[in-house]
């Protein structure tokens, strides 16, 4: 069956809840699950946060949020035209919802060597929690 907003699926040992992110481009879903250690992880999908998804995001311990570029470089990369967010956008959301851990992914790759430092530096202006900016194939202990 095709997914619907709020559907649950058992994947490995996890009860995964899928939610429609209300994309204006194409139908897309995020998901939320509780890890074996009791922590809640939410993946917002490949577009900016939509407030109608709040019940899936609020009270999570880990938020995976796309952050296409630094806010200070938004005029260069034009993330909003591509239906994407900036580091500032993701960090302000995580701060407002008091989410302790934020994973920023789906970033532009013009400065991979400096990306983590730059994204964390900008992010800390808007967010007091833990910021992770993984490289491809990185592992993060949840």
State what each model feature region is.
Residues 2-55, 136-142:
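Core dinuclear metal-dependent hydrolase active-site scaffold
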Residues 48-137:
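Cap/insert and terminal regions of metallo-dependent hydrolase folds
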């Amino acid at each position: 069956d095709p997914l619907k907003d709020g559907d649950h699926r058992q994947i490995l040992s996890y009860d995964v809840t899928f939610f429609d992110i209300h994309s204006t481009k194409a139908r897309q879903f995020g998901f939320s699950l509780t890890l074996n250690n009791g922590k809640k992880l939410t993946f917002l999908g490949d577009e900016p946060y939509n407030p109608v998804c709040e019940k899936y995001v609020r009270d999570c311990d880990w938020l995976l949020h796309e952050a296409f570029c630094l806010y200070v470089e938004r005029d260069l990369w034009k993330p909003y035209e591509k239906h994407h967010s900036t580091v500032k956008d993701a960090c302000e959301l995580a701060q407002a919802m008091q989410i302790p851990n934020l994973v920023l992914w789906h970033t532009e790759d013009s400065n991979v060597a400096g990306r983590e430092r730059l994204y964390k530096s900008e992010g800390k202006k808007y967010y007091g929690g833990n910021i992770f900016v993984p490289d491809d194939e990185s592992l993060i202990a949840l």
